[in-house]
Amino acid sequence: MAQYLLSVYQPDGPAPAPDFLEPIMRDVEALNRDMKAADAWVFGAGLHPTETATVVRQQGAEVLITDGPFAEAKEHVGGFTVIEAADLDAALGWAEKLARATTLPIEVRPIQH
């Protein structure tokens, strides 16, 4: 089976209020249980806010280390799930369920091995 990265994109800004976020997290946990029961779930995690990011890049002969995200954007990767699926259509099916659970855009990309 192929593996796919499901990236969850969230808008920049403060975290949602707990009363908004708690039902979403319950739905995500239920979906994760469904993925595990179907042997589709490999790994997943949420990410700390973008202000905790550090970027390392080569510039000429030097390596530069800077605080913050790589690029300014209106949204950023806030979490991800790695799944195994028979094909892209099956991966898109899981991504649709994740988009409904999170109410956020999900990017689906095959993983190279």
Q: Where in this protein do the model-derived segments appear?
A:
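Conserved, structured core segments of small domains
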Residues: 1-113
